[in-house]
Design a protein with these regions (language model features):
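A conserved mid-domain beta-alpha-beta active-site/ligand-binding segment of alpha/beta enzyme cores
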Residues: 139-185
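Active-site beta-strand->loop->alpha-helix modules in alpha/beta enzyme cores, enriched
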Residues: 1-119, 153-158, 172-175, 186, ...
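Residues at the C-termini of beta-strands that transition into short coil/loop
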Residues: 51-53, 127-129, 145
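Conserved small/polar residues in nucleotide/adenosyl-binding loops
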Residues: 217-220
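Conserved beta-strand scaffold positions in the cores of enzyme catalytic domains, especially
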Residues: 47-49, 123-125, 141
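Short acidic, glycine/proline-rich loop/turn micro-motifs
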Residues: 58-60, 134-139
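Short, flexible loop segments at boundaries between secondary-structure elements
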Residues: 113-135
Length: 220
């Protein structure tokens, strides 16, 4: 504890975190994720932390996607054999980690897309707090009731280490959960103005369609 406090107090800008600090950050973030999952009734045995190598740089800037990252993601998908995969398609993420994670998932999917069980698997991309899909691109719109929107907000708030001053491309000073909630409400309002049913909020998804029979995605 004393060594960690000393390191943090003397750390210089851009300096790599020590192994102890990286471990502490991992424990904090995994604990927050478990708390959020428990809140929305996700069973502990269904929570997996991949600890992808590209992320373990010890600095804000993460590494490039590597073969080991793709293999880890592919192994989990092959183990679970899901009917649906939900992946962050938020390419405006200031740190770029969502883009690398998306690339890892798509590269893994591209390598196993011709497996028989994958024919029944659908891949849905969602946006975070920074932007929303154009309405003509949306392929699945999930209505949220006021209570469901509160549940989403509360689950986001379980990630306490991420609540203040989340980076954003621009001068928007709203907190992450506020931007997310406003985005969901704005999507619902847009559907309402188009003459469709009115809801408190809507979560929108775009489907990723793998092209079967050939390898298109160049993995590391």
């Amino acid at each position: 504890h004393a060594e960690i406090n000393k390191f943090i107090s003397q750390k210089k800008d851009g300096e790599m975190d020590s192994a102890d600090v990286r471990y502490l950050k991992t424990i904090i973030r995994q604990g927050e994720a478990r708390t959020a999952c428990n809140y929305i009734n996700v069973k502990p045995e269904n929570v997996h932390f991949l600890n992808l190598p590209f992320y373990e740089t010890g600095t804000i800037k993460k590494g490039d996607l590597g073969r080991a990252d793709v293999d880890i993601v592919k192994a989990l998908i092959e183990e679970v054999k899901p009917h649906q995969i939900f992946v962050a398609g938020d390419l405006a993420d200031p740190h770029g980690t969502h883009k690398v994670c998306l690339d890892a998932v798509l590269a893994a999917i591209d390598e196993i897309k011709d497996e028989k069980w994958m024919q029944d698997c659908r891949i849905w991309m969602y946006r975070g707090a920074w932007a929303e899909w154009e309405i003509d691109h949306i392929e699945m719109a999930v209505p949220l009731s006021p209570e469901e929107l509160r549940q989403k907000r509360n689950s986001i708030l379980k990630h306490q280490s991420q609540m203040e001053n989340a980076p954003f491309l621009g001068d928007d000073e709203r907190l992450f959960w506020q931007r997310s909630e406003d985005r969901n409400r704005a999507t619902a309002e847009l559907y309402s103005r188009l003459g469709l049913a009115s809801y408190e909020a809507i979560e929108a998804f775009v489907e990723y369609h793998p092209i079967r029979g050939c390898l298109l995605y160049t993995s590391p």
